[in-house]
A protein has these predicted regions:
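Short, low-complexity, charge-dense intrinsically disordered segments
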Residues: 1-10, 136
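Nuclease catalytic cores
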Residues: 11-20, 31-35, 39, 43
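Conserved catalytic cores of phosphodiester-cleaving nucleases, focusing on short active-site segments
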Residues: 30, 53, 74-92, 103
Length: 136
């Protein structure tokens, strides 16, 4: 049980570090830039904080034993455990949540952050999503 608690604490700390990096980027740059600018700065913040990540990670579709590359890309995957989809749009829609949930299912990543930088306070543009644990 103690080992499980340690894993949960480590994961929570990592999530807080990631959200802190997002807040720092938004605080420094504010709204109004392209998504690509926020992504580059966010990745730099992750490096500064010592987190491993993959940028523009391909997401394949498994169909009848074949992995098909349809051009889907996840903006950032942090330490294989947190998927981050960045936006710089007027407002988040249900479609954007559906997009990240689909990426999470295809990537087998249980936690996602949907982030819209085009807001005055990042808390308004930050949405945490999670999938239930897989059962065998």
């Amino acid at each position: 049980m103690e080992q499980k608690d340690q894993k949960i604490r480590k994961y929570q700390d990592r999530s807080e570090t990631v959200i802190g990096a997002l807040i720092e980027v938004h605080r420094a740059l504010g709204p109004g830039l392209l998504e690509s600018a926020y992504e580059a700065c966010f990745c730099h913040e992750l490096r500064l904080r010592g987190l491993a990540f993959e940028r523009q990670r391909p997401v394949g579709i498994l169909y009848k034993g074949l992995i098909i590359d349809c051009g889907y890309r996840v903006d950032v995957v942090i330490e294989g455990q947190i998927l981050v989809e960045l936006k710089a749009i007027e407002r988040l829609l249900a479609l954007h949540a559906a997009q990240i949930l689909t990426y999470m299912k295809l990537s087998v990543v249980r936690t996602g952050l949907l982030v819209n930088f085009n807001v005055t306070s990042l808390r308004q543009g930050l949405r945490r999503l999670s999938l239930p644990p897989q059962t065998s």
